[in-house]
Each structure stands twice: as structure tokens, then as C-alpha cells.
Amino acid sequence: MEPISPKHITVTDPFWAPRIRTVADIVLPYQWQVLHDQVPGAPKSSCIANFQKAAHAIAAAKAGGSRPTYPTDKWYYDDKNSQEKAFMGWVFQDSDLYKWLEAAAYAIPYGNRAYLTEKSREAVEIIAAAQEADGYLDTLYSINGLQNRFTNLKDYHELYCFGHLAQAACARWTMQGERDLLDIACRAADCICRTFGKGKRPGYPGHPLAELALVQLYEVTGKADYLQTADFFIRTRGTRPLFFDRERGVDTDGSDYIYNQAHCPLTAQTTAVGHAVRGVYLYAGAAAVAEHTGNRALQAACETLWQDLYRTKLYVTGALGQTAVGEAFGPAYYLPNDLAYGESCASAGLVFFAQRLYRCHPHAAYGAVAELALWNTVAGAMSADGCHFYYANPLEAEGVLNDTVPERKHQALRRQNWFDCACCPPNVARVTAGIGQYGFYADDSTLAIELPLGAQVDTPFGQLQIISALPESGDFTVKITRLKRPFILRLRLPDWCKCPTLDGQPVTAKDGYYVQQITAPTTLRFCFAPTVRLLYSDARVGANAGRVALSRGGLIYALETQGAPSIHALTLDSKSPIVYRDGCLLAAGTCLQGGDHLYTTAPPKAVPCTLRFIPFCRRLNGKEDQMAVWVRTTD
């Protein structure tokens, strides 16, 4: 099944529509200023400045001048290690502008149209001026030394940046019908396809994304070269002799490349290892290639990796990446809450991976995991004001420790106004603005609803309107009007709802779906009652021993201290009723009182108290400086 184009979807959901409008009205104008280094107190971006420097170098060369040469041997460049006219920032700095453009393409229909349209055109002009004559586009090498391009695929990010360029171009073409950025992306893709492939130059991205993006370009343009090059990158990755060995002039056993998921062929990988974002981007690209090439072995490998993530490494919030060391996956069932990394980009990548596997094999589990990641980690990575963001998303935080303990330095207690490594803020913006494309799918005979998302959708079968009251209440109405032809409706029933009803009667699920033949305009009134649930971990997750997490509907909740001396002093009475009130869960519990001694033979005094849980996506927005998803219980 293929996703319905976001061009035909208007999100009206009470949870997501305000967030999309915030992206259009606040987030994107704010990020535009950041990219121009115009926000006082925010880390310097240098993104736009780099494009302008590259354009100047290209123009000077065309006029017969010489191009200056600067070092291209670093991950990060600043005024301490580089000259003023050289490239500044991270090697992937270009991608921030591309993600901004993609988010703008999706956000324009929801507000601030004139501003976003004008700035998008300005951005495209900036990018066009920085493209080399042969289509190559990466400001680091255009500024610092074009002769060194494609010489360090392992560490530097030319192909990764291209991936975001191509995705932005596809979004702009799809949503606005503008070819300008698509033409730029196709010229860049043609340069890559001429360079890499069978009988050409070997190699593959150190940071995956080009694979998925090339498939997306193929889906938009129909140009087979793009699919073939994506397939080449996937098939040759990790094969012997190892390309990264050849590139570096060494001979290793491949363990150095676990971080890049390039230690062995993807079809031989059975566990998710290495950098979490790179991993899910690679898996999404591989699943996309498998879909279009019919490579069953590759599809099976992707499913194996999915099962490893889903069963042993996925946080209850939909976060991925257990350790800050390498921003990486950890061992099975190692899911620390306080040291969790859970990069926002990893949850976004998990959604991409879920979508691509769903397209290969429509299974309810993919939509369920996408919902978990979107409603909890992705939604919580951006503040209500649209100007502050989380990079890491631990499931437990203590203000003093987060500020002073080295192992927690990666965990900002509060959302930040920007980062010098700013991959997450524009990523969250583009996923939020484009969320509709992950919710609705169709083939010749079937319309599938995979996310509980309020929206108006123009489908091949007629007009679909979904009126949702989630997550506040369970009312979920599906209206089909202007029917063009009969079809089969497949509605994924939320796995958190034990007793879904249709017109007051219990719904019978078939593999997680409500299925009905639609032959006439109709209205289906479902109720997915968002009851409170206690969640327990597999016993092998040591960090959660003796603890429970609370959820209501699709939202995971976090306990805040409300003045208690420590989050660890609070215990939930799991036998008492839990009340939902004003968006929070209230429960009976106890607070242990500290004494004068670090250790004592007397048990601490337990004082009854009321515990307050808020949605994880709204955590630490006020004065609170401690929170925990998994809490001790009296059981």
C-alpha cells in the first residue's frame, strides 16, 4: 500500500493541528532567524553563511579567479580552528536548511503562507547559487577544497546532506508543485549516480539517508538510475573488502564500522547496533529499496532488525538509543531511564522505518509503534512556544544531577533554544508538519487508516473525514462522502484500547483492524475509550524492576515531584484508583522522609501523598526539575 499524498490531507486533529500551526507561525520563522545567526543567545549556526560563501567561491571561479583552499579534516569548524572565510559549523550543517524547506512545504497550507512562500523561494535561490556546474552540492567542499570531495564518505556527510536536499525537493514538488528545488536535487542526484555504482566508483554513505532519499526521488520522477544507485549503496555496504578500509588505507576486522552499520552486509545483520539515527535511516532506506526491487532477503533482514528493536531496545515512550556513547543502541533489554539518550531524530527515523515496512507488509504493529513515537517523544521534543527543543529524551531527570554529573551532561533538563549540532529541531518540525502522510494509505481496493488522526482526506475512493476527540476522550468518527467507487476500509484499532465500540457495540478486530466493505456514503462512530493502564517491563529490564509506568490512551505519563525532596522518594499505591483530571493523572502514594544519616537501621518514614503524573510530551515545562516515567509501587 502507498501513503496518500500529504497534499490531499488536511490535519484537523485537536492534538496535532495546533502543533502544525505553531510550526507554521512560530517555529519556522524562529528557525529561519537561527539559520541566519540572528537569535541572541542561540548557538551560532553559520548555515546560510556557508551557502553564501560557497556561492561566492563558485562565482569567483567562473569569473576566472582562483578558489581558496582550507582544511577539510574536521567534523566541526569554528573561529578557533578555521579562518574567517572558511566553512563553519558541523560537516552536516547544510542539512538544517533542507529540513527547514521540507517543513515549510508541509506547513504552508496551515498558515503564514505569504511569509513561508517568500522565504522558501529565497532559500531555493541561496541553494541554487551554491551548486557546482556538474550538480555537486555541499558547501564544506565548495568552500574549503572541491578537490577533496567524496574522499571521506565514512566521516563526512556529503551524501547525507544530499538526502535531506532530495527529501525537501520531493516535499516542495508534492505540496506546491514547484520544480525549482527538484531540479537542483535531480542535478545533485545525477552527479552521485554518475560517480557511484557498478563499474564506477565504490562507496556508500557513512551516515545513511541518501538511500531512502534516492528512492523517494525515484518515486517522484520515475528515473531508474536513482533506484539503482540506492540499491547499490545498500547491497555493497559492509561487503568485503570493506570500502571504509580502502578509503582509510587500513585493513581491519570491521568492528570499527559497527557505529556506521557497515561492519557486515545488511542482510547479515540480526541486531540493531551502532549510532541509532544512522541505523533507523539505513533500515528505512533498505526497506524502501526492498519494496521496489522485490528483494525478499533484504526485506526479511529489515523485519529481523525491526523485531530486535521492537522486542528488546524500544523505550516505552517510543525513544531509541540507550547510550550517549556513540548516540547508540545498547544491548538487548538494557534500557536505563536516567542515562537514556533517546535522540529526537531517532524516533523520527523509527517512524520512517515503520512506514517503509508497512508498505512492504501492512501490519498493525508498524502503525502502533509510529503512534507511540509520534505522540510521546516527537511531540515532546518541541516546547509549546515553538522556540525550545530537546535533543535527548531520557525517561528520568533530576535537576541537580543533570547539571553536575558528567554521565548526564547530554541531558538538558529544559528544552534548549538551539544547539550547535542542531539536527533535531528542524527534524521535529518537518515530521510534525508532515504527519498526515504517515496516517493514511491506499491501494486499488483498500483504504487504510493507520494513525488515530483527525483529518480531512481526499482519497481515490471519495472524501474521508475523521473527527477525533483523542486524547481527551475516545470519540472517533469516520465519515465517508462523495463516494467514487466501493472499497474496503481498514481502520487500525489502537492497541491501548481494550474494548473499542462502533455505535455502542463491541468491535471485532481482525489482525488489529476493523474491516468493512464500503458501498455507500456512511458515518461510523467509534469510541476508543482512553482508560488508564499500568505498564510493566519484561523482567530482564533491570532498570524497571519493581516499577510501573502509567499511560492513558496513546500517551505515556511522567511523575513530577511537586515539592518532594526527590523523585525517588515517591511510591505509587497501585491498588488505589487513578483519576484523570485536567489532563493529569492523580494517584495515591507515599513520600519517604529523609533523616540525618546517610545510612541507618531504621526504615524511613512513609507519609501519604497524592502523586501527579503529566503527559511525557508535556514534561518539565514549568518549575519542576525532576520527573520519572517508571515509578516504584507498593506491589
Regions found by a protein language model. Give the residues of each.
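Solvent-exposed loop and edge beta-strand segments that line ligand/cofactor-binding
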Residues: 60-64, 80-97, 148-161, 194-207, ...
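C-terminal beta-rich recognition modules with glycine/proline-rich loops and embedded aromatic residues
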Residues: 8, 230, 302, 368-376, ...
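Catalytic-core region of carbohydrate-active enzymes that cleave or remodel glycosidic bonds
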Residues: 291-312, 335-387
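Hydrophobic core segments within long, regular secondary-structure runs in both alpha-
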Residues: 13, 20, 24, 32, ...
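A conserved hydrophobic secondary-structure block that centers on an alpha-helix together
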Residues: 144-220
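Solvent-exposed beta-strand/loop surfaces of large extracellular or lumenal domains
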Residues: 497-517, 532-540
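Well-ordered alpha-helical scaffold segments within catalytic/enzyme domains
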Residues: 16, 101-114, 163-178, 211-222, ...
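Low-complexity, Ser/Thr/Pro/Gly-enriched N-terminal "stalk/linker" regions
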Residues: 1-96, 121-141
